[in-house]
Regions:
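A short, well-ordered alpha-helix in the C-terminal region of glycosyltransferases
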Residues: 376-391, 400
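Conserved nucleotide-sugar donor-binding subdomain of glycosyltransferases
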Residues: 77-132, 167-189
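Acidic donor-binding loop of glycosyltransferase active sites
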Residues: 191, 293, 307-321, 332-335
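Conserved catalytic-core segment of nucleotide-activated headgroup transferases in glycan assembly
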Residues: 215-308
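Short hydrophobic beta-strand element within catalytic cores of glycosyltransferases
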Residues: 325-328, 335-339
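Donor nucleotide-sugar binding/catalytic pocket of nucleotide-sugar-dependent glycosyltransferases
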Residues: 143, 153, 172-227, 234
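N-terminal subdomain of nucleotide-sugar transferases
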Residues: 1-69, 113
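Conserved acidic donor-binding segment of nucleotide-sugar-dependent glycosyltransferases
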Residues: 354-361, 369-374
Length: 413
């Protein structure tokens, strides 16, 4: 089945390319590999965060057709706030309501009745309530497959207990059970669900024991993310954190690091600094900036920043899935200090390929040890690079997904 050329429809709440944050990087990595061997059509929602023409052109590099549908609900602003308020009175989650766009269903109706597909792949379960049962006369129904990315309702539950302001926690408490209902409904409707980690797969199977599942790990372009002779050398004092800074796990992780961990590092290494890289940081993160703490905003190329870093820090306390930031830094040959949750799903040996620490003092001690011993940091980085090349390339991840497509199609034969 893997050798069969498939016709695949990707439906997503965001474009895959150009990839600027983790969810896009997963989509881009898998789709660009699959596009080498299969016929891809993409239907994507585009909100005010993206340039529709730029995104469509970038995705046409590996798709036969890309159809963009404007989403009236922006990432920020009045429309988003009004929708959030409406969701409080709804039986459905905000995440589902945000992608319930009539124009999207109209496009899906047309594409699915005009063209034959073997697989309909939903990127995120939020679209699972839409109608994907149409198909041309005389053809078989395409199989519905969902890329989970993360168990979103579990993240929302975590946030309702420990994250953010009191108002945000109250909103999460009101929303997460509705999100659980909507998300599990999508998984149960699907012919197959693939997830980023074994831990997430277990969580799903606990809730939906009959689901057909597979693990398709996050990965990296190990040829793009690799040490280069032209990169600046690591300066021995710079720490780096990167990610989309508008997301709850990243906001919490950065805040926790700067407030609770950073003082233990800066006192031991007064010349050290932390560089926080990523788009859309909220005012609360800007307020943390200082002489030794800088926010760069979004950068087009992470590699020079990673190359110059002595250590990548991943102080995450919330979230699911697996962290693309870790895999990309491993591919760059960097020493990484992470919490257990941050490294969840990464098949790396603690102490050899990565350092794991869960409380502020031990996290700071791990970082301080690497800053004091550059040779050990370099050794861990080399070992991390080997793991990334052997286990976390997008080509390998795409082959795993192709095998899962085959399993789903064979079950329907």
């Amino acid at each position: 089945m893997i050798g069969t050329r498939l016709s695949i429809l990707y439906a997503s709440q965001m474009p895959a390319s150009p990839p600027r944050f983790g969810a896009q990087a997963r989509m881009h990595g898998l789709m660009s590999e699959l596009g080498r061997r299969h016929d891809l059509t993409a239907v994507v929602l585009i909100d005010d965060e993206f340039d529709a023409d730029e995104c469509r052109a970038a995705m046409m590099a590996y798709c036969r057709d890309v159809i963009v549908v404007p989403n009236p609900y922006g990432r920020d602003g009045l429309a988003k706030r009004l929708l959030q308020a409406r969701s409080l009175a709804s039986v459905h989650s905000y995440e589902r309501m945000r992608v319930t766009v009539p124009a999207l269903q109209e496009v899906l109706d047309r594409v699915l009745t005009e063209r034959r597909f073997d697989i309909v792949n939903l990127v995120f379960p939020n679209l699972g309530h839409l109608n994907f049962d149409q198909f041309p006369a005389g053809e078989k129904r395409p199989r519905l497959v969902v890329d989970s990315h993360e168990i979103a309702y579990d993240l929302a539950r975590q946030y309702s207990e420990t994250g953010g302001t009191a108002v945000r926690r109250l909103y999460a408490q009101a929303n997460w059970r509705k999100l659980r209902h909507d998300e599990l409904g999508s998984y149960r409707r699907a012919d197959g669900v693939y997830l980023c980690s074994v831990a997430d797969e277990r969580r799903l199977l606990d809730e939906a024991p009959g689901a057909r599942t597979a693990v398709v790990p996050n990965a990296a372009d190990v040829d793009y993310f690799q040490p280069r002779a032209t990169d600046p050398p690591a300066d021995g004092r710079t720490l780096v954190y990167f990610g989309l800074l508008s997301t709850t796990p990243n906001i919490d992780g950065v805040t926790h690091f700067v407030r609770d961990i950073w003082p233990h590092i800066s006192s031991a290494h007064p010349d050290s600094r932390i560089k926080i890289i990523g788009g859309r940081p909220p005012p609360s993160l800007h307020a943390l900036a200082g002489p030794q703490v800088s926010l760069t905003g979004f950068v087009d190329d992470l590699r020079p920043h990673l190359a110059a870093a002595a250590v990548l820090v991943v102080p995450l306390r919330l979230g699911g899935g697996t962290r693309l930031k870790i895999v990309e830094a491993m591919a760059m040959g960097k020493a990484i200090v992470s919490t257990s949750l941050g490294a969840e799903g990464i098949d790396a040996v603690a102490g050899r390929d990565i350092l794991i620490a869960d409380d502020p003092s031990s996290f700071a001690a791990a970082v301080n040890g690497l800053l004091a011993d550059p040779a050990r940091a370099a050794e861990i980085g080399r070992s991390a690079r080997r793991v990334a090349v052997e286990k976390y390339s997008w080509s390998g991840a795409a082959r795993s997904l192709e095998a899962f497509y085959g399993t789903v199609l064979e079950a329907a034969a």
